[in-house]
Amino acid sequence: MENLAPAGNWDALRSAVAAGADAVYLGYAAYSARAGAGNFDEQQLRDAVRFAHLHHVRVHVTVNTLIKDGEMAGVVDVLRLLSEIRVDAVLVQDLGVLRMARRCFPDLPIHASTQMAIHNATGVRFCRNQGMTRAVLARECSAAEIALAAKEGIEIEVFGHGAQCVAVSGECLFSSVVGGRSGNRGRCAQPCRLLYTYRGKTAAWLSPRDVCMRDDLPELNKAGVASIKLEGRLKRPEYVATIANSYRNAIDAMNNGHFRKADEAEMTGLRQIFSRGGFMRGYAMGAEDAGVIDPARVSHGGVKIGRVEFAAGNMARVRLERNLDDGDGLQIRTAQGDAELIYAGHDTEAGQIAVVRLRPDIRTKAGDEVYRLTSEKQLQWARSLAIPTIPADMALIAYPGKPLALTMTDGESSVTVTGDTVAPAQSRAMSEEDARRSLGKLSDTPFSLRALTVQTAGAFVPVSALNQLRREACQQLAEARIAAFTRKAGREEPADDLIYPDTPDAPSMAIVRTREQADAMQGAADLLVWYPEDFRADALESGLRDMPDGVWLQLPTVCEEKTLDALDAFVQRNAGKLGGIVLGSVGQLGRTWNVPMGAGSGIPVMNRRAVQFLLEQGCRFVTASSELSGAELRTLMQNHPPVVVPTYGREQLMLLHHCPARTYLGLTKGHAACRMCDQHSPDALAGQTLTDRRGTVYPLLRQRLPEGCLVRLMNALPTNNIRRVRQAGYAPMMVLTTENAQEAADVRAVMDGEMRELEGTSNHWNRPVE
């Protein structure tokens, strides 16, 4: 199992290598899903790859944002650079980037980013069919789904430690719609960490705990996971060192048959360096609802070290439960809020009283809890981790009348360098100890001397000659190690022309959830699409009977493999009634659907190469990303591809795997078997909302699957670009979600020109996303 560590900058990269990472993932200066990380410019990236490869650490580079048409040429330049410097893999989300990478740089290893929302075996099969060598699975996958996915023949990578996105991977538009900063383009403003009101209680209902699966590595290994990914490209180097070192030791122990769960000291260290809401074991290990979300706290919680026993003026006496050291960062949780300070005083042991000096603005009292946010000793330990030296053997041959020769090997690569002809000694001949003194001076190199053999007799060798030989051997062995670990140079093929397959014109579409919405929209568009609330077998059969012949079925964005099997069977069984299907995720292209299909909004498309890719895969139409502006749509629509444009409807801001209703009740088990909504329980999600600090109300809609519910967080207002899309001549996509019969009829009237306008927002039409 690969220990894959984050490297947001050079210091973090060095920390990862020092801590025992097998591979690192990092971002180039552009097109990375963590634009806020330091990332690497071109020269830094070249140096980083050489440095990592010298230490036999792989480098994965993220090019995993959605790309606009005007950026595609720049992305190809980046791919060319990554191919040239021979990075070990490139992570992508955008289908246009995937297509260009596979066509122009066929030898460049491509990994499916978690943003691609690959969440079942069918999705991994799609990745394999497209020539990708690894899939980073969505964080919501269960261990059973991971095991099925691992049988598809490519590597599986899972997130094992750190912060979690609360929305289903790749399916979040909240930051984009509310603030214009797109998470799909690396600029998420994290509205999930804000407070919202649910049923009158204000809390962080969208803020997940950090995950820690350090103790679950054997189960993940058994499931077929090839790489455990540690989150943290925005974290400090000391965090990277601490986490990567912990997982390094655990993986080594597992491989040696001596695995043990982390003891209290190690787990405390993991919590101390950074933990939000304590830790959860992740969806893979069965975390659910209140076990996923920590409504009480959105930031680093640290480790509790004691309570205030007495406070007066600028001083507090704290009874310690853990040792306290000079320089520790503390947080006192007072009635007025959290107060943070740096402890300056004597190191004090648990059980004793520590005197803490307070700033004038801090008001605390007896009983207030004190937490340590940073441990100075832990940080010093993390900084002290040295990059391991590379053990090397040397063999020196120095005989008079023959060239001086030094062979140096690390056990895999070997180099021999020669010097001038050796002269006979006139007085004192070179000894083995003389040679060791000169050749062993390796402190300014990545090597350490493991063994030295010297063959000599009566030779005079100047110290300067030995030093020169040592320098040349070290330099050549470093180059040999890099070359041995670096994949072969790849070829570049020219990009093909942007030519779309022959397809019918884009259809206008109306997507409905209910029978009354379907009645209102009947005949209003070329295609009527049914997006069920309930995907269980009985509900699908009865719901389809209420729909007109020729209706298209919208597939869910996320579902387990067995659910997709059941949907496949349902589609085949009802092929005579269904007009076709709308795919909910790109991974659903991993199986053959014997009915017409189109690409829905769950497959984000921002550029023409992505359109080309999906049409080549057999889609009859493609849905444009709702993050495109009107001007960007004009570029996308050049040459009139069969692209439908989101025109009316509440934007799905998030697709949640946890249920706010169950989280509110503190439930941590029983998600799949929950029947609160079915039984119309007063505690059910139906009709509930989240309200932000400004009073904006966001509806919550459930989507029932056999494996349990997903929850759709909808925008407060519908997008309404009916007039703009009509004037542009695009094929509109109308999406009805919360509309009742009258509201649905009003939407129809506006479409038919019988009403002038409806309430709504233009979304990004006049406001391009960052």
Task: Describe the function of each predicted region.
Residues 121-122:
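Conserved nucleotide-cofactor-binding alpha/beta core module
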Residues 9, 65, 93-97, 116-118, ...:
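Short glycine-enriched loops at secondary-structure junctions
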Residues 40-45:
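Glycine-rich, highly charged phosphate/nucleotide-binding loops
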Residues 1-18, 23-34, 46-49, 55-83, ...:
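Surface-exposed amphipathic alpha-helical tracts and adjacent flexible/coil segments at the periphery
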Residues 37:
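A short acidic, glycine-rich active-site loop
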Residues 100:
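Short acidic/His/Gly/Ser-rich catalytic and metal-binding motifs that mark active-site loops
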